[in-house]
Amino acid sequence: MSKPFKLNSAFKPSGDQPDAIRRLEEGLEDGLAHQTLLGVTGSGKTFTIANVIADLQRPTMVLAPNKTLAAQLYGEMKEFFPENAVEYFVSYYDYYQPEAYVPSSDTFIEKDASVNEHIEQMRLSATKALLERRDVVVVASVSAIYGLGDPDLYLKMMLHLTVGMLIDQRAILRRLAELQYTRNDQAFQRGTFRVRGEVIDIFPAESDDIALRVELFDEEVERLSLFDPLTGQVEATVPRYTIYPKTHYVTPRERILQAMEEIKDELADRRKVLLANNKLLEEQRLSQRTQFDLEMMNELGYCSGIENYSRFLSGRGPGEPPPTLFDYLPADGLLVVDESHVTIPQIGGMYRGDRARKETLVEYGFRLPSALDNRPLKFEEFEALAPQTIYVSATPGNYELEKSGDEVVDQVVRPTGLLDPIIEVRPVATQVDDLLSEIRQRAVINERVLVTTLTKRMAEDLTEYLEEHGERVRYLHSDIDTVERMEIIRDLRLGEFDVLVGINLLREGLDMPEVSLVAILDADKEGFLRSERSLIQTIGRAARNVNGKAILYGDKITPSMAKAIGETERRREKQQKYNEEHGITPQGLNKKVVDILALGQNIAKTKAKGKGKGRSTAKTGIVELDMTPKALQQKIHELEGQMMQHAQNLEFEEAAQIRDQLHQLRELFIAAS
């Protein structure tokens, strides 16, 4: 099923890219465990990584620090590798409230979560791709270090069907029930099956638009065909097919029975400890809750909160790392850590926060001590599991630099010839008035300005002051959700306003070629927001414009400022020298404004199979761009209802047309959530 990686791009590597690609590939072939790609803003880091993947033909996991950047990378990788398996693996919760206990007020908070079905399907698709083929790029968030079902048990549970195989209908239905598929002869949807005489239709859990029809003759599989679950049209017949479990957490019956005995043993030991410490209430609470869970597991094969017993279900010892997405990645896989200066510290912090909450639950009798082993990976476990790694950042952290040693690959020269911004340091005393005159100069020539302050109060006061002086200004703060933030950025690019004021939200991954000036107020106040890395990242926001400039307001030059200015000047000199040697004139980027939000548009085109290309499909792509996630979800439910109604009325063309709209909306929802 695997194909070779085939890179689809109209451009050839240029600038520093060819040298960076060569050095990274040589390092990987020489067996280097850690390398760092120091790539400046706009130098085409993703394109460099895509070239490395295509040349070395190795399955790859790309870790991003948040869902927004993961969605952006997924869209880019999907365009680079349209013929290969580019998958998306992020948390499937739209909303998640973990189980917790607050001793001070004696308050127990039940686990409450809302699962996004489309993202769940994409997660299942990602693990299936890793198990079945080698031409895989999985773009994941830090969700990848959280516990997932054991790949060995997952593989054991799969149902393999081949034409000519002897198996009776009841055996197939029993196996489907074990895989947690449910029978539904009326509404045929993901993770269900229906039976009509000797024909079984199965809608695989990891599939979005293809179902399997199993035709039996007596006790023999006569034909296997793939069909469109909406129209019923047969797409192809296949000699064999593998049905994967409906969830990553499915467990064979014998393993559940064995786990139940181990849980009973642990419960008996824990009860003795609690009674010895005179904790009668905790002992009663724990017994009651655990007995209830055991009863459910015995009857149904699972229970609410079954993940708390994952250590027993996967057969691991106390303290052993949980199975994660890394266990599904082949041994010769490649790991790319994007924006590594943010992602690496995130990975380190996940375990401790989770541990503190669970220890309280164990202490007060809500959970058995084994629940502590349902956790994300510790940092040292992540290090042990990670395959050969490339860290990608414009400002690599100390960890990456230490691990890479001399293997820091510079990618400073941009293919467009754009230079790093000119930096000026100006006094604090006149910073606001000076900024106002700079803004007015930019507004006249239709360019935008980013201003970063140290405090929320100052950002609010500055916004108010600029508004009073007739400037079109908006304020970006932490209370604004991801989608609204994207809309503000889009409006800035479209020229709805000229100035965007923020605190710490104007750093990684913002792509705005229209911004020609970045103003950093109080740049001489040494600290987290004015560290060398923060300054370089913020200055980099003006690096996509031909007239890029950064003004640092400060009365003295701090060590961080000196390092940031020195590094920016080093890069600028190297870029200028390259341009002179090769006769390159810097060109401004001409990136379409809708690109930020329409991350899924091209993806949807590759998924849609040329069906239902009516007017409504084209219209959806534009109209839905500025909808909130809630409105998008509502629209998706509404269209799903319409689609099923058309299918029931045998109006298959209309149903297929709506299905194509749904593809687009779901991709937009991923980008937005």
Curated annotation (Swiss-Prot):
Keywords linked to the UniProt accession: ATP-binding, Cytoplasm, DNA damage, DNA excision, DNA repair, Excision nuclease, Helicase, Hydrolase, Nucleotide-binding, SOS response
InterPro entries named among the record's database cross-references: Helicase/UvrB_N, Helicase_ATP-bd, Helicase_C-like, P-loop_NTPase, UVR_dom, UVR_dom_sf, UvrB, UvrB_inter
Motif Beta-hairpin, residue range(s) on this chain: 92-115
GO annotations of cellular component type: cytoplasm; excinuclease repair complex
Domain (UVR): residue spans on this chain: 633-668
Role noted for this protein: The UvrABC repair system catalyzes the recognition and processing of DNA lesions. A damage recognition complex composed of 2 UvrA and 2 UvrB subunits scans DNA for abnormalities. Upon binding of the UvrA(2)B(2) complex to a putative damaged site, the DNA wraps around one UvrB monomer. DNA wrap is dependent on ATP binding by UvrB and probably causes local melting of the DNA helix, facilitating insertion of UvrB beta-hairpin between the DNA strands. Then UvrB probes one DNA strand for the presence of a lesion.
Name recorded for this polypeptide: UvrABC system protein B
UniProt lineage: Bacteria, Pseudomonadati, Pseudomonadota, Gammaproteobacteria, Enterobacterales
